[in-house]
């Protein structure tokens, strides 16, 4: 079952037809602008920023070639991708279907984030990707360093508060970052797709098995620090989870839940870009969330927690610290086995504000970014939310 691979917690673009040879295909990565945006006829510029801990990240700024001049240009919008994805996920379908293009066509100043470790953000001032120290990070670092630096940079360049859009892990990062006043004060509003701050009700069969089998500890024992699904070693390791244990014939559903509107005919094309690498530490942190039912910083164990945090347990990210005045919009689905409805409801109960909600019973985790009908089902509502915020915006 060499097809399994794109599985692990990913929420990407796989179906039962995917094979190992497909997954191991080389990526055409030059730059996101050159690969995906310019060929569609859109304006795109590459930007580079450096985080406080030395990672070199790529940002892209995208504009429509024919903006609707009857509409006032909207404020800048930052799109933050999910786990094992990069900014390319917002442009993988046609301009009429992809959120990055759709927002640009509505006159928004579109910025695209790519976290450390992805093939667009594979640099560091002193470390190489072959150094284990390069991979010593989890989603809390993506929130506190990567996302915080992106928001600061866009805020400075655009001279405006920004609209923040996150999907999956991008929402985990957003929730954590928005508990920090210095980040929240630069954000006009947030739109979160498949919002996650808690994961203890995950029911995806393959994810449950990986947690039970302690896959995170297995890869550490193998001396691995990077999760790269284009490597033979990881393909074989993840493949073994299905052998004789469970039915993995529909890999995407076993990870994310059933997706109603995913375009399976484009898998070959998607796999030219996805999946992107992440770190073993990041996977371990996500597994900690599932096991402990917490939204907390990375748990190093009793002694190192004391040395790192000054307490025996890692500090929680308090959703109550997100400003009640920050407008939020959330889209979630009844078929999503990662952003489970029970966990979403817990998140809502702890937020000081009352976000606007879009619930789609038939939508799974991937539908919110790759559904062929997402423009009508999801994106038009998000854009209405953003435009309503402009009435009180200083932009």
What are these regions (language model features)?
Residues 354-395:
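Catalytic active-site module of serine/aspartate enzymes centered on a nucleophile-bearing elbow/loop
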Residues 16-20, 156-160, 169-310:
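Alpha/beta-hydrolase-fold enzymes
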Residues 132-157:
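Alpha/beta-hydrolase active-site loop
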């Amino acid at each position: 079952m060499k097809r399994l691979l794109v599985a692990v917690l990913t929420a990407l673009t796989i179906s039962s037809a995917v094979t190992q040879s497909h997954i191991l295909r080389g990526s055409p990565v030059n730059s996101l602008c050159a690969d995906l945006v310019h060929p569609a006829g859109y304006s795109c510029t590459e930007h580079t920023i450096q985080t406080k801990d030395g990672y070199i990240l790529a940002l892209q700024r995208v504009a429509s070639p024919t903006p609707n001049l009857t509409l006032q240009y909207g404020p800048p919008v930052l799109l933050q991708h999910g786990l094992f994805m990069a900014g390319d996920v917002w442009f993988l379908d046609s301009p009429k279907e992809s959120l990055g293009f759709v927002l640009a066509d509505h006159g928004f100043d579109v910025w695209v984030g790519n976290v450390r470790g992805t093939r667009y953000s594979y640099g560091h001032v002193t470390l190489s990707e072959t150094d284990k120290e390069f991979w010593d990070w989890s989603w809390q670092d993506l929130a506190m360093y990567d996302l915080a630096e992106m928001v600061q940079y866009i805020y400075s360049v655009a001279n405006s508060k920004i609209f923040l859009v996150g999907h999956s892990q991008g929402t985990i990062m957003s929730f954590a970052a928005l508990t920090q006043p210095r980040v929240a004060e630069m954000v006009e509003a947030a739109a979160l797709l498949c919002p996650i701050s808690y994961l203890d009700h995950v029911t995806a069969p393959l994810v449950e098995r990986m947690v039970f089998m302690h896959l995170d500890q297995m890869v550490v024992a193998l001396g691995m620090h990077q999760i790269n699904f284009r490597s033979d070693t990881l393909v074989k390791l993840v493949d073994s989870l299905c052998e004789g244990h469970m039915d993995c014939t529909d890999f995407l559903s076993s990870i994310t839940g059933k997706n109603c509107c995913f375009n399976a005919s484009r898998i070959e094309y998607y796999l030219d870009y996805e999946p992107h690498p992440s770190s073993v530490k990041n996977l371990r942190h996500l597994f900690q969330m599932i096991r402990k039912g917490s939204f907390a910083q990375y748990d190093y164990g009793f002694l190192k927690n004391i040395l790192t945090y000054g307490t025996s347990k890692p500090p929680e990210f308090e959703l109550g610290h997100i400003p009640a005045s920050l407008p939020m919009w959330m889209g979630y689905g009844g078929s999503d086995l990662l952003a489970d409805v029970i966990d979403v409801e817990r998140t809502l109960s702890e937020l000081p504000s009352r976000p606007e909600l879009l619930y789609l019973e038939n939508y799974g985790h991937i539908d919110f970014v790759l559904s062929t009908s997402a423009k009508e089902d999801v994106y038009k509502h998000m854009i209405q939310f953003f435009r309503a915020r402009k009435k009180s915006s200083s932009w």
